Amino acid sequence: MFMGEFEHSVDTKGRLIIPAKFREQLGEQFVVTRGMDGCLFGYPMTEWTALQEKLKALPVNRKDARAFVRFFYSAATECELDKQGRINLPKSLRDHAALTKQCVIVGVANRFEIWSAERWNDFSTKAEEDFDDIAENLIDFGM
């Protein structure tokens, strides 16, 4: 399970250190792709495979399903860690998440997310303000 919040920076070549706690769970290869809310999603191969099965089951006759799958897969990249525990993020992914220097990597149960520090600060400030309301709304989902 991925949890915690870690600050790192992207270098000029697009390399980003993955936290040691996450590296242990990721294995040799994993996938990073565009995420929602302006961040990137990272999945261990087992989670990525399970997600692929769900995405393949979406109806191709639905325009929104086609658009989502196309957008999600088109930027997906298999990553391998170098000897320093870094991955190389393609420019398209860095652009999607506005990653220029300071990043925040957060654990979100079965995946991790990569945020620009600025976007993460904005998101977490808003989430903290709305936390009670969000929690109350989740009661509808059995929480």
UniProtKB/Swiss-Prot annotation:
Coiled-coil boundaries: none
Main location: cytoplasm
InterPro entries: MraZ, MraZ_C, MraZ_dom, MraZ_N, MraZ_sf, SpoVT-AbrB_dom, SpoVT-AbrB_sf
Entry GO terms, CC: cytoplasm; nucleoid
Keyword Cell membrane: no
Protein location: Cytoplasm, Nucleoid
UniProt xrefs under SUPFAM superfamilies: AbrB/MazE/MraZ-like
GO terms for biological process, alphabetical: negative regulation of DNA-templated transcription initiation
Superkingdom: Bacteria
GO MF annotation: an example: transcription cis-regulatory region binding
UniProt keyword terms in alphabetical order: Cytoplasm, DNA-binding, Repeat, Transcription, Transcription regulation
Residues in SpoVT-AbrB domain copies: 5-47, 76-119
Pfam families assigned: MraZ
Protein family per UniProt: Belongs to the MraZ family.
Assembly and binders: Forms oligomers.
Protein name: Transcriptional regulator MraZ
Annotated source species: Levilactobacillus brevis (strain ATCC 367 / BCRC 12310 / CIP 105137 / JCM 1170 / LMG 11437 / NCIMB 947 / NCTC 947) (Lactobacillus brevis)
